[in-house]
C-alpha cells in the first residue's frame, strides 16, 4: 500500500506539486515557505517512487531461506537485515539512489517555484542564462550537468551489470 501511495507524487506533474506546496506553505505554514526543507520535501514526494521501486525489486530477489538461515543461527532481526538482506539489496538501493539523484539534478519546475531566494542550482543557472538569452553563461553549467548525468549513468549501468551475475 505504501509503495502505491508513493506513485501519486510521481504521477502528478512537477509544476502542479510545486504550486500545491506554494498554496499550502504560504497559506498554512508560512515559516516553511521558500525554505530548503520544503524543496527537499517536494523532491521526496516527487522522486520517492523511483527509490522505492528499485529497492523493492532488490528485496523481492532475496531468497527468504537466506534470511531464515540467519535467524536460525541466532541473529536478531536487525542483525539479519544488516548481515544478509542489506548486502544482497545494496546494488538496487545504490541504483535507486543514483536514479533519484539524476532526476533531481534535472528537475526544473519544482526547483524554480520552491527554491529559497538566492538558492541556485545548476538547472536554475542554465534557466536564468537561457531566459536572458545569455547562452555563453549557460555553457559551463550545462557541461557540468552533462558530466554529472553521465557519471550517474555510469553508476546505474555498473549496478545493472553487477546484477546480471545474480
Describe each model-derived feature in a short phrase.
Residues 1-3, 15-48, 66, 78, ...:
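Membrane-interfacial helix termini and adjacent extracytoplasmic/periplasmic loops
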Residues 12, 45, 52-55, 63, ...:
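Transmembrane alpha-helices
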Residues 18-29, 42, 54-56, 97-104, ...:
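A structural signal for multi-pass alpha-helical bundles of membrane permease subunits
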Residues 56-67, 71, 75-83, 139-166:
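C-terminal transmembrane helix and the adjacent membrane-cytosol boundary/short C-terminal tail
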Residues 50, 91, 149-153:
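Hydrophobic transmembrane alpha-helices of multi-pass small-molecule transporters
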Residues 105, 111-154, 161-164:
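Interhelical loop and adjacent transmembrane-helix boundary motif
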Amino acid at each position: 500500500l505504501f509503495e502505491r501511495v508513493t506513485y501519486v507524487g510521481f504521477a502528478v506533474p512537477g509544476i502542479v506539486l510545486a504550486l500545491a506546496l506554494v498554496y499550502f506553505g504560504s497559506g498554512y505554514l508560512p515559516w516553511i515557505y521558500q525554505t530548503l526543507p520544503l524543496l527537499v520535501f517536494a523532491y521526496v514526494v516527487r522522486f520517492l517512487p523511483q527509490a522505492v521501486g528499485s529497492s523493492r525489486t532488490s528485496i523481492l530477489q532475496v531468497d527468504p531461506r537466506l534470511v531464515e538461515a540467519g535467524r536460525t543461527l541466532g541473529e536478531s532481526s536487525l542483525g539479519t537485515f544488516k548481515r544478509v538482506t542489506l548486502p544482497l539489496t545494496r546494488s538496487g538501493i545504490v541504483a535507486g539512489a543514483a536514479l533519484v539523484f539524476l532526476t533531481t539534478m534535472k528537475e526544473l519546475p519544482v526547483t524554480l517555484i520552491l527554491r529559497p531566494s538566492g538558492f541556485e542550482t545548476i538547472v536554475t543557472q542554465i534557466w536564468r542564462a537561457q531566459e536572458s538569452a545569455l547562452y555563453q553563461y549557460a555553457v559551463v553549467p550545462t557541461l557540468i550537468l552533462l558530466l554529472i548525468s553521465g557519471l550517474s549513468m555510469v553508476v546505474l549501468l555498473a549496478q545493472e551489470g553487477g546484477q546480471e551475475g545474480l
